[in-house]
């Protein structure tokens, strides 16, 4: 009986950390890898790469825990989230807080093996991860904070490799914020009706009937910034082909969301994993060439 209870609790923690849904971790991982490859340039040191890959998964899990903790009073009123561990009672509030602290502590232990500049930047990463889930109560732009949280690994990666945060770093950071606003608006379009009922704010609500147009403008800006980064770093034509492929994926996403159906919007959101992957492959091949 004790093993059954323990097993159920571990499964609940597993769901709370979203380890069964890796899309969020992947959307956090790709910009991190972009930054490491550009900052090096090429293949980064194995230990630095390992620290950032592990840190991505740990902090994404921590972000999911604090997000569900912040939304625990709302999730029970939304069909898609009603069965999450906190509103369903599978995990207590105290257990969620403890799990968050453990995940953050493990992440910080990894960062302590890097240089001082990276350690100091990690404090801001923690603040962004904690603040983001609460922003949707006060502003229609929580996706901007999400983009900053998901992109803060970019200056950390540059700092870890070169102890500097050059122009390319901040252009990539900006590109990631715009990308995150675009894809998380697609995600928010799935829950727009429910969010309106319970008073949750989002860019999907703010943009209203202009949502598709604004997403398109953001996507074009992302492509322009990534092309500029390629030019500043002297990357080869293979990289620019990857930017074009990413653009084709954005066009496909626009076709998906044209009718604003929930499943299609979610599919468009998920497709962004391929955008991140394609851009990383373009970077990697450019440095190999």
UniProtKB/Swiss-Prot annotation:
Gene3D superfamilies: UbiA prenyltransferase (1.20.120.1780)
Cross-referenced InterPro entries: HB_polyprenyltransferase-like, Prenyltransferase, UbiA_prenyltransferase, UbiA_prenylTrfase_CS, UbiA_sf
Membrane topology: Multi-pass membrane protein
Transmembrane segments: 23-43, 46-66, 99-119, 141-161, 163-183, 213-233, 234-254, 268-288
Domain of life (superkingdom): Bacteria
Signal peptide: none
Cofactors required: Mg(2+)
GO CC, any one term: plasma membrane
EC top class named in words: transferase
Protein name: 4-hydroxybenzoate octaprenyltransferase
Gene: ubiA
